[in-house]
Amino acid sequence: MFPRCFLFGSDLMDLQLTQRNSISNHGASDSAPMRESDDRVIETSIPARLDDLRWSGFHTRVVLALGITWILDGLEVTLAGALSGALKESPTLQFSNFDVGLANSAYLAGAVLGALGFGWLTDRIGRKKLFFITLALYLAATAATALSWSVTSYALFRFLTGAGIGGEYTAINSTIQELVPARYRGWTDLVINGSFWLGAAMGAVAAIVLLDPALIGPDMGWRLAYLTGACLGLVVFVMRMWIPESPRWLMIHGRPDQAHAIVDDIERSALGRVQDQPQRAWPKIKLKMRDHTPLREVAHTLFVSYRQRSLVGLVLMIAQAFFYNAIFFTFALILTDFFGIASNQVGWYILPFAAGNFLGPLLLGRLFDTLGRRVMITLTYGVSGVLLALSGYLFSIGALSAQTQTIAWMVIFFFASPAASAAYLTVSETFPLEVRALAIALFYAVGTGIGGVVGPALFGALIDTGSRNSVFAGYLLGAALMVVAAAVAWRYCIAAERKSLESVARPLAFME
């Protein structure tokens, strides 16, 4: 367990006393929020103080406790892909390829609706409450999936699991963006999103063991695989007890003193002391606090004030969602139906695939903060699309073996993984704080709904034809979407690297 360096464990109930002491000790400091004659207007340096911090144990704990969402999602998606053969062989479920695609689409449909519903709540009631609610839903639904008795029940529980994960994406992306200093934001976001593939590797290993008929019966292995995910999620509850509410969210929503106390504690954790204004003249912003942001203002912000940014986010999300979900959800079917790989051996092929996906963000991520968003998003989307078209052609003419096909996927997704992560980075940093979570939810939902839900079902149907040329046509569609997204990024992407969130997108509550 992480050492307790600040006030967010069992001391949470004493926060009001802490705030009073903090205000008493630092009330004369210019870093404290200053109220004007209008009690709803404040001047604060909280964003500048958060961005001024060096990387510390606090930030590492935030990344571990919140970033594990992507590990859970990777575990879920990999199990869904690796277990497809086992579900077809299950004496209870007896799935067809269409049933596999349908269940995977149910998971993504749940993620779409969960992102929208929980995204709205995240902006309204706060980040911290939501990342406990969504985790609870994920745990319950994943455990229930292990008890499925029919195609319908399995699809329903996968839908609910997806809803939990979709909600996690909105709450977690918002919180990480708002707590991580600006100069680390791009690399951190990409690596956290890339940690999806650590979960994928875990799922692959679990599938290898749990699907071995010599060890576990054909109708029990896949059930134990889902219980593995639920058990992992229990650990996350403890880890998240130490994570505070976003100070940026608090300062907007009428709780500036609590936000100031939290930043004081973060500074003590990172620096061993609270920074004072005389040591560093932080820029301040003037804000008019609000309880919530009306949906009409949200819609106007996204589709009028930030229409061009919305278009960029939508294109990037649709392209990467179709590209990723269509290929990865049907990964096992390609290996079993076209290359004759036994379903209990698919996990071995996922491991190198997962390695390429994790190494991409890890090795290329820093370039998003140095060379910049526009250059790197264009490069990764464009290269991914071209490589998929080339490998798809080689697949169609039968020039690839199971091993060389896996190597091709590994190289493709070395570039596609940071591209997909950059889509989330783009939509989470280029909109105002008050609508950030809902913006993430909306573009994730639309992108996944169009690209993700359709993709697995389409590829499942293409694979069922038994025609390599039909599958190649699907690959060409995914490649074309990525190339189009690359062109859009080159023309319209925002240069948000190393800039504060408030300078990239001014808060709606900002006052001159």
Name each model-derived stretch.
Residues 2-8, 12-512:
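Transmembrane-helix signature of 12-pass secondary carriers
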